[in-house]
Amino acid sequence: MSMYRFPEPWATAEIPGPKKAAILSRPEALVAVLRRANRRLLVTGSKALDRVEGIDTIELIRILYSTRLFTVAASRNIASKLEDTGIPVAASISVYELGDRLRDTGWTGFDGFGRYDLAAFIGFPYITLWLVLSGLKHFAPGLSTISLDPYYQPHASWSLPNVKGDEWYSFIRKVSDSLR
């Protein structure tokens, strides 16, 4: 995977502060992070309907779901599409509302079994995810976040670097294969 030594966020006028996302440059690093977590949430956004440089984001979500590690939450416009492809959605919810729930230390998750300790995000408009991750970074103690989009997100706990579509697909595929 090509990696920039100092990846740049796409929102160049915004300053993420001194604490920035750790770069996931190798699939093994993401596998280790996922294995350490107890309750994982995969959050999918409206841009999952788009193809990124020829890569079908829904296919990547299906690959990630096949590991059986994640509970899936989806933006309202994508939930039915995911269910049509065989991916059960625990909740159809706005990412802003979900961000508010994730920062609530008393929330017990969609299934009532306790708080999620890791939330992975894929398929969101860049600036939308930037804002949600900024809020979670500052106001959600005990929650780790991962940006699985092919663009560096400095407000996440971990993020992929800026990568091309084929590298993105290969990375997610290697993660999935390692977790089976």
Where do the protein language model's features map onto the residues?
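C-terminal functional extensions of proteins
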Residues: S2-E28, Y96-L118, G123-L133, H138-R180
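Redox- and metal-dependent alpha/beta enzyme cores, enriched for Fe-S-associated oxidoreductases
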Residues: P27-A37, T44-E97
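Nucleotide donor/acceptor-binding cores
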Residues: A37-R40, L143
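Conserved beta-strand elements of the Class I
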Residues: L41-L42, A120
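Short loop/turn segments at strand-loop or loop-helix junctions that form parts
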Residues: V43-S46, D149-Y151
